[in-house]
Amino acid sequence: MKKYFEYTDAVSNKFWEINLKGKQVTLTYGRIGIKNPAQIVKKFKGKSASEDAKKFAASKIREKLTKGYLEI
């Protein structure tokens, strides 16, 4: 699952992307148009790793939507 969000207002022009692959979640974010955006990789371990990764991704998506980001 890969989702892309943007937040734009008078002073901000940001993006945020989440990529869920099995037990790993990759978050990429920064100003729209920059060459090297920041990236965080979170790996989950254990029997429920895939489910934990899904819950984490859903939580982060809710957080960004609450802050005003729009899914593109």
Please describe what each predicted stretch is.
Residues 36-72:
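Mixed-charge, Lys/Arg-enriched low-complexity segments
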Residues 1-26:
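Short N-terminal "domain-start" leader segments
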Residues 16, 25, 32, 47, ...:
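Broad hydrophobic/π-residue packing in well-ordered secondary structure
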Residues 20-43:
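Short aromatic-glycine-(Arg/Gly/Cys) micro-motifs in beta-strand/loop hairpins
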